[in-house]
Design a protein with these regions (language model features):
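N-terminal Rossmann NAD(P)H-binding glycine-rich loop of SDR-like oxidoreductase domains
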Residues: 11-20
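Conserved NAD(P)H cofactor-binding loop of Rossmann-fold oxidoreductase domains
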Residues: 74-82
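Short alpha-helical oligomerization interface
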Residues: 83-96
Length: 230
């Protein structure tokens, strides 16, 4: 059965890979991002929009009014950051793009889904949500908020027929990773395959690769001990 899917932040990286795969499967796709569609003018409908702009919620409301309800929304938008003191000027924007805009997107979609008692929101988070990073505090904070919010909303909304999936990726070969060392890095197409599987299985949370997730959790545990005793 064909699904109607809204992709936020699908102009490159994992979002672009997911878009290409969904189109090949025959799904009905609408994309929204600040940059043009990865498939060009012959691709599916694509809306150019900065998701941090004040008018973004109204753009979503108009889209829902004109297009009708979506079965699924996949939120792929994210930006990285590397903090170089004393410049903190981009910290708030990172949190706005990565976290606040996701919350605003779900807020626009949830009422219709609750009324229909069906819908699925998939958010792309990061294993970086589980440790402290002095070089990228806004990024790790945004992903920590992202993951905690989506898992919590999933617990709330699933009781009403609406599914929420939080996918925590390790390093993916896109423009996003800022680290010099990127172990167990996967391609955007490999990451997209995990997203597509989540469309079918609807887990509350998926962490990939799992070994990296366990390693990062261990790092967080050691960080917490050091901070506790500092």
């Amino acid at each position: 059965m064909t699904q109607k899917i809204l992709l936020i932040g699908n102009s490159d990286g994992i979002g672009a890979a997911v878009t290409r795969t969904l189109i090949a499967r025959g799904e009905q796709v609408v994309g929204l991002s600040r940059s043009p569609s990865p498939l060009g003018p012959d691709g599916p409908r694509h809306i150019l929009q900065d998701i941090t702009a004040p008018e973004y919620p109204q753009v979503l409301a108009t889209l829902l009014a004109n297009e009708g309800p979506f079965d699924v929304c996949i939120f792929c938008a994210a930006i990285g950051s590397k903090l170089t003191l004393p410049d903190l000027s981009q910290e708030a924007r990172v949190i706005d793009v990565n976290f606040t805009s996701m919350v605003r997107t779900l807020a626009a979609l949830a009422p219709g889904w609750l009324e229909r008692r069906q819908g699925h929101f998939i958010g792309l988070s990061s294993l970086a949500d589980d440790f402290y990073n002095a070089d990228s505090p806004a990024y790790t904070a945004s992903k920590a908020g992202f993951s905690h919010y989506l898992v919590s909303m999933g617990l709330k909304l699933r009781l009403h027929g609406v599914y929420v999936t939080n996918i925590r990726f390790g390093f993916v070969d896109t423009k996003l990773p800022k680290a010099s060392w990127k172990p167990l890095m996967m391609t955007a197409d490999q990451a997209a395959a995990h997203v597509l599987r989540c469309l079918e299985t609807k887990p509350r949370q998926l962490s990939v690769p799992k070994f990296a997730g366990l390693a990062i959790h261990g790092i967080r545990w050691m960080q917490s001990i050091r901070i506790w005793w500092s």
